[in-house]
Amino acid sequence: MTPSLANFLWSLVWGTVIVVIPVTVGLVFISQSDKIKRNF
């Protein structure tokens, strides 16, 4: 693997991590607060 390809793959990995983790936490938090409000 060339260094530029490795850097590209790592940037994809970190970009995915940076996007996916906050979205997942946010969705879980919203669904939890929705349950409390709606008394489901």
From Swiss-Prot:
Location in or out of the cell: Cellular thylakoid membrane
Reported function: Involved in the binding and/or turnover of quinones at the Q(B) site of photosystem II (PSII). PSII is a light-driven water plastoquinone oxidoreductase, using light energy to abstract electrons from H(2)O, generating a proton gradient subsequently used for ATP formation.
Membrane topology annotation: Single-pass membrane protein
A matching Pfam family: PsbX
Main localization of the protein described in the UniProt heading: membrane
GO cellular component: photosystem II; plasma membrane-derived thylakoid membrane
Organism: Crocosphaera subtropica (strain ATCC 51142 / BH68) (Cyanothece sp. (strain ATCC 51142))
Superkingdom to which the source organism belongs: Bacteria
Transmembrane domains' residue ranges: 10-30
Protein name: Photosystem II reaction center protein X
Similarity comment: Belongs to the PsbX family. Type 1 subfamily.
